[in-house]
Curated annotation (Swiss-Prot):
The protein's name: G-protein coupled receptor 52
Native species: Mus musculus
Miscellaneous: GPR52 is located within an intron of RABGAP1L gene, which exhibits epistatic effects on GPR52-mediated modulation of HTT levels by blocking this modulation.
Subcellular location: Cell membrane
Transmembrane domains' residue ranges: 45-65, 82-102, 116-136, 160-180, 206-226, 266-286, 297-317
Pfam families according to UniProt: 7tm_1
Gene Ontology MF: a single term: G protein-coupled receptor activity
Keywords, sorted A to Z: Cell membrane, Disulfide bond, G-protein coupled receptor, Glycoprotein, Membrane, Receptor, Transducer, Transmembrane, Transmembrane helix
Its biological purpose: G- protein coupled receptor activated by antipsychotics reserpine leading to an increase in intracellular cAMP and its internalization. May play a role in locomotor activity through modulation of dopamine, NMDA and ADORA2A-induced locomotor activity. These behavioral changes are accompanied by modulation of the dopamine receptor signaling pathway in striatum. Modulates HTT level via cAMP-dependent but PKA independent mechanisms throught activation of RAB39B that translocates HTT to the endoplasmic reticulum, thus avoiding proteasome degradation.
SUPFAM superfamilies according to UniProt: Family A G protein-coupled receptor-like
Length: 361
């Protein structure tokens, strides 16, 4: 009964908004329609900027991994590369709503385009989030079980885990094609997605319980315990320094305290960014599916805030790795050296003089 009333209210609300804007669609952020160019300028700028950052950032990560063989010796690199490929595809997929904002007349089969786009980007974000959780588990095992880590985490098991992540992500959103509900608000740029494809409280709880909540809890649990271990190591080093203020302990403090402190700060940034970008989206997803809140502006902002995590991943997880930074620096030096050598070669090569009143091809 409440479901039917909510549907009727939304249809009436949308019909009244359509009457108000007459021939034009309303923009997602509610700033109205720009009738001069037939484009929602602000929304287009936001999506184009995010798309550029996501594609350029993850292309850099993938290129450095392929050009730096040392990175392949780290087990975390398997998940970082998988996450980079998934986030790169997120950026490429974001070109679809950009084109939709630039040209509202999408033609036939808008419902199919909306469903396919929503499904694909939901799967890619699921892979990215699952990789974040797997990276945290990998770091947790490396710190808590250092002696048996190489036996627990093998390349074969890592490949199987990555395959299972893709299969699980594809299956968990598949019921959206069978009328269970909308997997998210990524496709609400399309008119059909925003007005005709409604969310379902049961399907939302299904996704949150099987994907978002486990990933968030795993990240919180593992990094919290890693942070505790780092603090414990720092405390032990400080106690040893207080009891035995020798040169050996001073050297161990300089070699051990600073890395632990830096690692703890990296973990704090990782966890903070993860929750700041994903928690608003999850909360709004639950509230809107429960018919408590319906705000297109919040829907747009929380959705693209969560999608921006695809750019933050490549910045935090890659640039916090010292080996990756070394590979990036060497790659940059190689490219700069090749450019300088090419310019020097051009400067050294003698150029033939042109005769007056002559033509050269």
């Amino acid at each position: 009964m409440n479901e039917s009333r909510w549907t009727e209210w939304r249809i009436l609300n949308m019909s009244s908004s359509i009457v108000n804007v007459s021939e034009h669609h309303s923009c997602p952020l509610g700033f109205g329609h720009y009738s001069v160019e037939d484009v929602c300028i602000f929304e287009t700028v936001v999506i184009v900027l995010l798309t550029f950052l996501i594609i350029s950032g993850n292309l850099t990560v993938i290129f450095v991994f392929h050009c730096a063989p040392l990175l392949h010796h780290y087990t975390t690199s398997y998940f970082i590369q998988t996450m980079a490929y998934a986030d790169l595809l997120v950026g490429v997929t974001c070109l679809v709503p950009t084109l939709s904002l630039l040209h509202y007349s999408t033609g036939v089969h808008e419902s199919l385009t909306c469903q396919v786009f929503g499904y694909i980007i939901s799967v890619l974000k699921s892979v990215s989030m699952a990789c974040l959780a797997c990276i945290s588990v990998d770091r947790y095992l490396a710190i808590t079980k250092p002696l048996s880590y190489n036996q627990l985490v093998t390349p074969c098991r890592l490949r199987i885990c990555i395959i299972m992540i893709w299969i699980y992500s594809c299956l968990i959103f598949l019921p959206s094609f069978f009328g269970w509900g909308k997997p998210g608000y990524h496709g609400d740029i399309f008119e059909w997605c925003a007005t005709s494809w409604l969310t379902s409280a049961y399907f939302t709880c299904f996704i949150v319980c099987l994907l978002y909540a486990p990933a968030a809890l795993v990240v919180c649990f593992t990094y919290f315990h890693i942070f505790k271990i780092c603090r414990q190591h720092t405390k032990e080093i400080n106690d040893r320094r207080a009891r035995f203020p020798s040169h050996e302990v001073e050297a161990s403090r300089e070699a051990g305290h600073s890395p632990d402190r830096r690692y703890a700060m990296v973990l704090f940034r990782i966890t903070s960014v993860f929750y700041m970008l994903w928690l608003p989206y999850i909360i709004y997803f639950l509230l809107e599916s429960s018919r408590v809140l319906d705000n297109p502006t919040l829907s747009f902002l929380t959705t693209w805030l969560a999608i921006s995590n695809s750019f933050c991943n490549c910045v935090i997880y890659s640039l916090s790795n010292s080996v990756f930074r070394l590979g990036l620096r060497r790659l940059s030096e190689t490219m700069c050296t090749s450019c300088v050598c090419a310019k020097d070669q051009e400067a050294q090569d003698p150029k033939p003089r042109r005769r007056a009143n002559s033509c050269s091809i």
